[in-house]
């Protein structure tokens, strides 16, 4: 079980390889990364049998940028018939698992396996339960079977609290009919990824205020309004009338890069198509100057050296806050709804000073 298998957006296999190889080196896990361009997956093959497990245990999945999902395990070949018997035979070396996910890569060929996986899962789940290899226990590892075809599958394990919250890392979000653009799903997915669900009522509620830079027609504004926030939408373009009719949106025709709120707000969101360094500087200014407490900003990526550029920008942001003496929680992820971009989330942390006993 020395291979770490990872899902990703097609075309970003090289970024996954660069990122995971860097973490493996940090954790002294020897091996090599490999991937085929356009395959929507990558592998890190460890030279030691426990290498993949050490890599997963030493790295929080939520802090990875480009991998959508990961699992440690092995590839096995399957016959045309009686695939379940072959899988059960290989599972003798696996522990009892607490859940089962069948996955496929995010390519056209992978999507064609969707119906097969749905039907096969019913029979496989029954066989695993009867064999005592599957129980309903989230504390036990998750069994992840990624089908490359009907004849080849990656059998892997991942901890449910240190892997993707959805199969293949693809969220099942429904597009709101009254949202003005599909970009609204980017912000909703960002909240799912960066904010624990049990903290939404505390950090995303109706008594809050927000600013949406580059708002038109209002996809991201819609999410803020849907949580009951008062929103200032900054854009020289028109906003959707349905949003303006809510009475919760003030539309200002201004430049998103020069606008400064008169009073600090709770949230700033920005999906402006601009050079990533400029959007990163916007993040640093808004959080650093105290204009907002939390922010979600998209960074558009260059054509080459994408992981290196993201890493450089994140390091620059972090160094900027250190120089200001400000504690900030920083997250970055290429979300499923992102294309040639990554989404950054920043949250300014407040130091709680201990009061001296008199």
Where are each of the predicted segments found?
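SAM-dependent transferase fold signal centered on methyltransferase-like domains
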Residues: 1-358
